[in-house]
């Protein structure tokens, strides 16, 4: 059985995180987001983004990476304070991505579990996540007990897309999913 390790991301991980981000983005959204609207998602601009996040975290943001037994980053999760302040949730998952070959193996759950434990340690009580409505990931969050909160329209490139928020009102309820 291959071993996986979850750890806190450091600055030098930015490029690898960007690789995973762009590669998963393109495979997850190829049928959801217009190619033109996706064209500005490049490894270069994502690397710059993650370097900034890891150097100067805003909103109490932190990033966890998932490494395989060769210490290659194959997935990551990030989050921090809930950004809209509209729904009464204090924490938010900003991103969760895994390379294609590592999906459907329980590794998203591994990241989600590690992240929610970390959020609880940081004093968060609840958790929200926004997912493009047509993204199959909404099933993943539902499987772990998230409830639909709200939907709104977002702009990506020149296109508009619907996003749905899912939430856990109590992080403990999410943590309990992993001890069942």
Roles of regions detected by a PLM:
Residues 1-15, 172-180:
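Conserved N-terminal entry element of GNAT/NAT acetyltransferase domains
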Residues 11-12, 22-32, 38-101, 112-114, ...:
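Acetyl-CoA-dependent GNAT
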Residues 106:
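Conserved G/P- and acidic residue-centered "switch" motifs that form tight phosphate/ATP-binding loops
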Residues 119-130:
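Conserved GNAT acetyl-CoA-binding A-motif
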Residues 128-132, 142, 147-164:
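Conserved catalytic-core motifs of GNAT/GCN5-like acyltransferases
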Residues 137:
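Helix-turn-helix
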């Amino acid at each position: 059985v291959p071993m996986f390790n979850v750890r806190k991301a450091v600055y030098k991980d930015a490029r690898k995180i960007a690789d995973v981000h762009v590669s998963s983005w393109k495979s997850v959204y190829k049928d959801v987001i217009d190619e033109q609207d996706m064209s500005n998602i490049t490894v270069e601009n994502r690397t710059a983004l993650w370097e900034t996040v890891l150097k100067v975290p805003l909103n109490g943001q932190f990033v966890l990476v998932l490494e395989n037994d060769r210490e290659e980053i194959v997935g990551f999760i990030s989050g921090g304070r809930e950004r809209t302040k509209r729904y009464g949730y204090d924490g938010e998952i900003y991103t969760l991505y895994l390379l294609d070959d590592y999906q459907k193996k329980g590794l998203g759950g591994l990241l989600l579990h590690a992240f929610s434990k970390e959020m609880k340690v940081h004093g968060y009580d609840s958790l929200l996540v926004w997912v493009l409505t047509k993204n199959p990931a909404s099933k993943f969050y539902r499987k772990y007990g998230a409830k639909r909160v709200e939907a709104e329209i977002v702009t990506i490139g020149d296109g508009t897309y619907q996003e749905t928020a899912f939430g856990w009102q109590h992080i403990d309820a999410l943590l309990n999913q992993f001890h069942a």
